[in-house]
Protein backbone atom coordinates (compact mmCIF):
# COMPACT_ATOMS: atom_id res chain seq x y z
CA UNK A 1 0.00 0.00 0.00
CA UNK A 2 2.68 2.52 1.05
CA UNK A 3 4.80 1.46 -1.89
CA UNK A 4 2.06 2.31 -4.39
CA UNK A 5 1.40 5.63 -2.66
CA UNK A 6 5.08 6.56 -2.77
CA UNK A 7 5.21 5.65 -6.46
CA UNK A 8 2.21 7.90 -7.19
CA UNK A 9 3.52 10.81 -5.10
CA UNK A 10 6.95 10.73 -6.76
CA UNK A 11 5.29 10.74 -10.19
CA UNK A 12 3.12 13.67 -9.09
CA UNK A 13 6.14 15.82 -8.23
CA UNK A 14 8.07 14.45 -11.22
CA UNK A 15 10.97 13.11 -9.16
CA UNK A 16 12.62 10.00 -10.64
CA UNK A 17 13.78 7.37 -8.13
CA UNK A 18 15.52 4.02 -8.42
CA UNK A 19 14.06 0.88 -6.84
CA UNK A 20 16.77 1.10 -4.17
CA UNK A 21 15.90 4.72 -3.34
CA UNK A 22 12.20 3.88 -3.03
CA UNK A 23 13.04 0.99 -0.73
CA UNK A 24 15.24 3.24 1.45
CA UNK A 25 12.48 5.86 1.72
CA UNK A 26 9.91 3.23 2.75
CA UNK A 27 12.34 1.59 5.18
CA UNK A 28 12.99 5.01 6.72
CA UNK A 29 9.25 5.43 7.31
CA UNK A 30 9.19 1.95 8.88
CA UNK A 31 12.07 2.75 11.22
CA UNK A 32 10.61 6.14 12.13
CA UNK A 33 7.28 4.53 12.97
CA UNK A 34 8.96 1.80 15.05
CA UNK A 35 11.34 4.08 16.99
CA UNK A 36 8.67 6.72 17.47
CA UNK A 37 6.71 4.44 19.78
CA UNK A 38 9.59 4.40 22.27
CA UNK A 39 11.42 7.69 21.62
CA UNK A 40 8.66 10.12 20.61
CA UNK A 41 10.57 11.47 17.60
CA UNK A 42 7.55 13.00 15.84
CA UNK A 43 3.94 13.88 16.61
CA UNK A 44 2.91 12.17 13.36
CA UNK A 45 1.94 8.61 14.37
CA UNK A 46 0.64 7.03 11.18
CA UNK A 47 2.99 5.71 8.45
CA UNK A 48 0.74 6.99 5.64
CA UNK A 49 0.78 10.47 7.18
CA UNK A 50 4.56 10.20 7.68
CA UNK A 51 4.94 9.51 3.97
CA UNK A 52 3.14 12.76 3.13
CA UNK A 53 4.10 15.05 6.02
CA UNK A 54 7.71 13.96 6.38
CA UNK A 55 8.97 12.25 3.23
CA UNK A 56 7.16 14.17 0.48
CA UNK A 57 7.27 17.42 2.45
CA UNK A 58 11.07 17.02 2.40
CA UNK A 59 11.46 15.79 -1.17
CA UNK A 60 9.66 18.71 -2.85
CA UNK A 61 12.77 20.74 -1.99
CA UNK A 62 15.12 18.37 -3.86
CA UNK A 63 14.94 19.99 -7.34
CA UNK A 64 15.84 23.37 -5.84
CA UNK A 65 19.11 22.38 -4.16
CA UNK A 66 22.24 24.02 -5.58
CA UNK A 67 25.67 22.80 -4.55
CA UNK A 68 27.11 19.65 -3.05
CA UNK A 69 27.61 20.16 0.69
CA UNK A 70 24.59 20.80 2.92
CA UNK A 71 23.70 21.07 6.58
CA UNK A 72 20.23 20.39 8.00
CA UNK A 73 19.91 22.39 11.23
CA UNK A 74 17.49 21.25 13.92
CA UNK A 75 16.96 18.14 11.85
CA UNK A 76 14.99 16.19 14.49
CA UNK A 77 14.78 12.57 13.30
CA UNK A 78 16.54 13.55 10.04
CA UNK A 79 14.06 15.73 8.20
CA UNK A 80 14.49 16.89 5.50
CA UNK A 81 18.11 15.65 5.49
CA UNK A 82 17.66 11.88 5.26
CA UNK A 83 15.07 11.83 2.42
CA UNK A 84 17.14 14.42 0.53
CA UNK A 85 20.34 12.40 1.06
CA UNK A 86 18.63 9.26 -0.26
CA UNK A 87 17.53 11.08 -3.41
CA UNK A 88 20.83 12.95 -3.88
CA UNK A 89 23.64 10.41 -3.39
CA UNK A 90 26.08 12.81 -5.09
CA UNK A 91 25.60 15.41 -2.32
CA UNK A 92 26.69 15.27 1.34
CA UNK A 93 24.50 16.20 4.28
CA UNK A 94 25.41 17.03 7.87
CA UNK A 95 22.44 16.49 10.21
CA UNK A 96 22.64 18.69 13.29
CA UNK A 97 20.51 18.30 16.41
CA UNK A 98 21.03 18.89 20.11
CA UNK A 99 19.12 15.79 21.31
CA UNK A 100 21.06 12.54 21.60
CA UNK A 101 18.09 10.23 20.98
CA UNK A 102 17.51 11.84 17.58
CA UNK A 103 21.18 11.49 16.63
CA UNK A 104 21.18 7.82 17.69
CA UNK A 105 18.14 7.21 15.51
CA UNK A 106 19.76 8.91 12.50
CA UNK A 107 22.93 6.87 12.87
CA UNK A 108 20.93 3.65 13.07
CA UNK A 109 19.00 4.62 9.93
CA UNK A 110 22.23 5.36 8.05
CA UNK A 111 23.69 2.01 9.17
CA UNK A 112 20.63 -0.16 8.44
CA UNK A 113 19.69 1.49 5.14
CA UNK A 114 23.26 1.90 3.85
CA UNK A 115 23.13 5.69 3.49
CA UNK A 116 26.75 6.83 3.17
CA UNK A 117 26.39 10.55 2.44
CA UNK A 118 25.13 11.76 5.83
CA UNK A 119 26.92 12.48 9.09
CA UNK A 120 24.98 13.16 12.28
CA UNK A 121 26.30 15.61 14.86
CA UNK A 122 24.93 16.30 18.33
CA UNK A 123 25.35 20.01 18.96
CA UNK A 124 23.50 23.27 19.36
CA UNK A 125 23.73 25.16 16.09
CA UNK A 126 25.35 28.28 17.56
CA UNK A 127 28.09 26.13 19.13
CA UNK A 128 28.86 24.16 15.96
CA UNK A 129 31.98 25.40 14.15
CA UNK A 130 32.54 23.34 10.98
CA UNK A 131 35.93 23.06 9.30
CA UNK A 132 34.23 23.27 5.91
CA UNK A 133 31.41 25.75 5.29
CA UNK A 134 28.26 24.72 3.42
CA UNK A 135 26.74 25.37 0.00
CA UNK A 136 23.30 25.18 1.60
CA UNK A 137 21.89 25.56 5.11
CA UNK A 138 18.51 23.81 5.38
CA UNK A 139 15.91 24.54 8.03
CA UNK A 140 12.48 22.92 8.36
CA UNK A 141 10.26 23.62 11.38
CA UNK A 142 13.37 24.68 13.28
CA UNK A 143 12.88 28.33 14.19
CA UNK A 144 11.65 31.65 12.88
CA UNK A 145 13.53 32.95 9.84
CA UNK A 146 15.04 35.67 12.04
CA UNK A 147 16.38 33.14 14.56
CA UNK A 148 17.58 30.75 11.87
CA UNK A 149 19.65 33.47 10.19
CA UNK A 150 20.94 34.82 13.49
CA UNK A 151 22.01 31.40 14.81
CA UNK A 152 23.28 29.99 11.49
CA UNK A 153 25.01 33.03 9.98
CA UNK A 154 28.45 31.36 10.33
CA UNK A 155 27.56 28.19 8.41
CA UNK A 156 27.32 29.04 4.67
CA UNK A 157 30.33 29.19 2.37
CA UNK A 158 31.02 32.41 0.47
CA UNK A 159 28.34 31.76 -2.15
CA UNK A 160 26.21 29.52 0.07
CA UNK A 161 22.47 29.89 0.54
CA UNK A 162 19.94 29.43 3.29
CA UNK A 163 16.94 27.24 2.44
CA UNK A 164 14.09 28.03 4.84
CA UNK A 165 11.16 25.61 4.55
CA UNK A 166 8.06 27.35 5.81
CA UNK A 167 4.31 26.84 5.87
CA UNK A 168 2.26 30.00 5.57
CA UNK A 169 4.37 33.12 5.20
CA UNK A 170 3.53 36.02 7.48
CA UNK A 171 4.39 39.63 6.67
CA UNK A 172 5.56 40.01 10.25
CA UNK A 173 8.12 37.21 9.95
CA UNK A 174 9.37 38.52 6.60
CA UNK A 175 9.82 42.00 8.06
CA UNK A 176 11.97 40.59 10.87
CA UNK A 177 14.70 39.27 8.54
CA UNK A 178 17.93 40.74 9.96
CA UNK A 179 19.95 43.36 8.12
CA UNK A 180 22.62 41.88 5.87
CA UNK A 181 20.39 39.11 4.46
CA UNK A 182 18.39 39.10 1.22
CA UNK A 183 15.59 36.78 0.08
CA UNK A 184 16.54 35.90 -3.50
CA UNK A 185 13.62 33.59 -4.26
CA UNK A 186 10.29 32.56 -2.74
CA UNK A 187 8.98 29.29 -4.16
CA UNK A 188 5.51 27.91 -3.52
CA UNK A 189 5.77 24.16 -3.04
CA UNK A 190 3.00 21.63 -3.68
CA UNK A 191 3.13 18.52 -1.51
CA UNK A 192 0.94 15.64 -2.74
CA UNK A 193 -2.12 15.04 -0.50
CA UNK A 194 -1.25 17.97 1.75
CA UNK A 195 -3.82 20.75 1.67
CA UNK A 196 -1.60 23.27 3.43
CA UNK A 197 0.65 26.07 2.26
CA UNK A 198 4.33 25.29 1.84
CA UNK A 199 7.06 27.71 0.79
CA UNK A 200 10.79 27.57 0.24
CA UNK A 201 12.73 30.77 0.81
CA UNK A 202 16.24 31.06 -0.62
CA UNK A 203 18.27 33.61 1.32
CA UNK A 204 21.84 34.88 0.95
CA UNK A 205 24.14 37.08 2.99
CA UNK A 206 24.78 40.46 1.40
From Swiss-Prot:
The keyword Ubl conjugation is annotated on this UniProt entry: no
Compartments it resides in: Cytoplasm
Amino-acid positions noted as binding S-adenosyl-L-methionine in the UniProt annotation, renumbered to this chain: 74, 79, 125-126, 140
Entry-linked Pfam families: GidB
EC nos: 2.1.1.170
This protein's UniProt keywords: Cytoplasm, Methyltransferase, rRNA processing, S-adenosyl-L-methionine, Transferase
InterPro entries xrefs: rRNA_ssu_MeTfrase_G (IPR003682), SAM-dependent_MTases_sf (IPR029063)
Catalyzed reaction equations: guanosine(527) in 16S rRNA + S-adenosyl-L-methionine = N(7)-methylguanosine(527) in 16S rRNA + S-adenosyl-L-homocysteine
Family from the record: Belongs to the methyltransferase superfamily. RNA methyltransferase RsmG family.
Function field: Specifically methylates the N7 position of guanine in position 527 of 16S rRNA.
Protein name listed in UniProt: Ribosomal RNA small subunit methyltransferase G
Organism: Shewanella sp. (strain MR-7)
Gene name for this UniProt entry: rsmG
Amino acid sequence: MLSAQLEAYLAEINLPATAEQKKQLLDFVGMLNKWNKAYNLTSVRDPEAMLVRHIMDSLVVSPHLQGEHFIDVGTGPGLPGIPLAIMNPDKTFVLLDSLGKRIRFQKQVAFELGIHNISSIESRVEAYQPEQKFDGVLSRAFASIHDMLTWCHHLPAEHGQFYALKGQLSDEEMQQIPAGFVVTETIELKVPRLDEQRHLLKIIKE
